[in-house]
Amino acid sequence: MDDKFDDDALPNSKTTPEDYGDKLAEYDYTNTFPNTWMRLREPFREYIAEFVGVAVLIIFGVGADCQVVLSANTGVAPSPKGDYLSLNCGWAIGTAMGVWISGGISGGHINPAVTLALMAWRGFPWWKVPGFIFAQLLGGIVGAGLVYVNYIHAIDIVEGGRHIRTLDTAGLFATYAADYMTNVSCFFSEFLATAVLIVVIHAMNDKRNAPPPAGLAPLVLFFLILGIGASLGMETGYAINPARDLGPRMLTAMVGYGRQVFAFRNQYWIWCPVIAPFLGAQVGTIFYDLFFYKGQDNVFGRLGSHIHISPA
């Protein structure tokens, strides 16, 4: 049986600088460094890129949440500054900009669920995973902290004082499901949205499918996140990214909201915005690999590949 897997199929998770249209620098960063700083920073560039990418994602996304919701209070603004579409645009732009910044350096994961799926199914080095996830989580905390400082006075007005913090404004930073949703329904919603996310990401990176032209991956992600928010976002706030929820949630716990942000619905935070995206990304990847992917790193494509059937 002939091998139908081509060498030019996408070999792993990391999108190369060439895929983003970057030109090589005048010197090779991997072998020659013009000064000590360039040499010292090299081992950390990928992790810093993930940190900054997630921080930018949160600044745009949580910033949009804060501006739209807080401005609805007449004590903050004379008229509302946006609507649900504004929220979705904020998250879509944040995702696109975060990937634009980090894509040519780290691959632009900016999502622990994506990182883990790429490790399991695309050959992403396992030893990089803890550092990537830590950087992503830290980026979520720092990004949320910057937005909190920016909007602290408006939050004070809405809450009624500096030392009053409730889930009403905690929901600007992390996701809290609608009251009518059961935890099982919330889990399914996050699972489904993340599975859709990862399937499109794999299709976008699959050279045997229909990848976007060089440099346009962030634009595809913009429409992807905008679409997920418009279709699946109302009930849970579509975390679809553990770092997007857990990082800001930890920030709120540190700035005065306390344990209530973790006690909501008996540890809702761990099942729906964390575990569900991780599982959704795994199942979405399995689905894509089973039915579409033809790259050499497709685990299902290698099963039984050593068996050759001779014609009768």
From Swiss-Prot:
Locations listed in the record: Membrane
Cytoplasmic-side positions: 1-50, 111-128, 205-213, 289-312
Glycosylated residues in this chain: 183
Main location: membrane
GO cellular component: plasma membrane
Residues exposed to the Extracellular side: 72-89, 150-183, 235-267
Transmembrane found in the keyword field: yes
Keywords: Glycoprotein, Membrane, Repeat, Transmembrane, Transmembrane helix, Transport
Stored InterPro entries: Aquaporin-like, MIP, MIP/Aquaporin, MIP_CS
Annotated motif NPA 1, positions: 111-113
Domain of life from the UniProt record: Eukaryota
Motif NPA 2 positions after renumbering to this chain: 241-243
Annotated catalysed reactions: H2O(in) = H2O(out); glycerol(in) = glycerol(out); NH4(+)(in) = NH4(+)(out)
SUPFAM superfamilies, per database record: Aquaporin-like (SSF81338)
Listed GO MF terms: glycerol channel activity; water channel activity
NCBIfam families hit by this protein: MIP
Similarity comment: Belongs to the MIP/aquaporin (TC 1.A.8) family.
Domain topic, free-text comment: Aquaporins contain two tandem repeats each containing three membrane-spanning domains and a pore-forming loop with the signature motif Asn-Pro-Ala (NPA).
Name of protein: Aquaporin Lacbi1:391485
